[in-house]
Amino acid sequence: NPASSLETPVLDKLASGGMVFDGAYHMGSFSGAVCSPSRRMIMSGRTLWHLKPTGKKRRKKGKKVAEPSGPNPHRYTLPAVFNKAGYATMRTCKNGNSYEGANALFTVRRDATKRGGTDSSGSAWHADQVLDYLSQRQKQKKKAPFLIYFGFSHPHDTRDGRPELLKKYGAVNHTDRSKLPPANASQPALPPNYLPKHPFDHGHTSVRDEVGVKGVWNKRDEYTIRNELGREFACSENIDIQIGRVLEKLEAMGELENTYIVYTADHGMAIGRHGLQGKQNMYEHTWRVPFIVKGPGIKPGSRAVGNIFLLDVLATVCDLAGIKAPATSEGLSFRPVLEGKKEVVRDVLYGAYCGGGRPGTRCVKKGDWKLTKYDVTKTGVRHTQLFNLKENPHEFIKAHQSPEVTPLTGVKPGPGQVNLAGDPKYAAKLKEMEALLLEEMRRHDDPYRLWNQPDDGLVVPVIKAKPDRKKPKKPRKPKKKP
């Protein structure tokens, strides 16, 4: 993004040497920890509602119907498939909120959560693990092909960056909740779609990401958001540096031009956009993911829409490696896009979030048009958004035109850059997108239906509240008198 003040020379070079996808997405989440189903989809190639290998039954008009079951992680996931094909597999990433059954199958596994501002406590640690692994391969003269899953703990909060990078982006590791962080001209500007508050309950207002991130908490003022963006930028540039170290090692080994490199993320993040902070929403800034692929046969400096999901990664890397993808994978290989033979692999994209109030948020995108619906039963919120993303890529809503907001962002949306759901001129388009959303929900075995949809005979899933596991403190015994 040339408009961003974030400096990522390594990723810029990777992009200029490969292909950038402008339409890459995660499918969604049924929990506040969006990274968990996102990573499980990468590992398994399964769609969102087919992830849980429960084998349970649900009722449909009085009849028992088998729930879609997920794959056995010991047989059909990314490391298992490549292990079987003779690859040496290695991973390093954060601990937790992932796919443990698959993670355990990597031949070499070095996971730890590293969100500090030093080499030993931050992103450099993850790079060190990959560099050590490659050095050992080189020393032992191993010839087997390799698959490396190279992940980081940052830029997930807490975003305690390296001091020199925090200084570069005018940020501080703010810890005093009673005060605002200091203003600094070096901080990133507010995003164009910044809001001081989301205008309605989006379904998960109490999740940790929205109220408990250290340095932000429930604040959405300019000082807090710009400082947190600076912290995110500091962490992101450090990741760029660490990726560069590994790419330099591959080049020194003579392997760089013989290796497919896929760069992506679990999800996006709001940090002030639309008045939100976390990842529990389906706006473009959070639903979309960055995606770059470089490797043999890919035209340098190319760009495509793609319309890909993270769950397509397994099918694609298998295709590139000449390995048969497991039958349990539901992903589509986007190799034809990489080779310039196609612009997209699917015409319609479906997304869901119901980690908070259910049914939650659903969205569907086709071409330039996107429909998002919010159905939060516990608060009675029922809201519909219709956007033409070509005309309104930032998904501006009426609140963005407020005289309290435009001076802060320096952006005044045009008259057509609003939610079009209530405009009679777009009634036909709204009806078309509503029908498309229902079709996608049925196709993906979404267990919920929204307020204006037929229930299809589905019994609303019952989500049991987690019991309070804290044991009551026992009263202290009085001390015996001497």
Each PLM stretch: what is its role?
Residues 35-37, 101, 284-288, 329, ...:
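Short, solvent-exposed loop/turn segments at the edges of secondary structure
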Residues 11-16, 43, 79-83, 90, ...:
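Non-transmembrane alpha-helical segments in soluble domains
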Residues 2-39, 45-46, 50, 88-90, ...:
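Short, structured active-site-proximal loop/turn typified by the sulfatase FGly-forming signature C/S-X-P-X-R
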Residues 8-9, 42, 94, 256-262, ...:
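Polar, surface-exposed loop/tail segments
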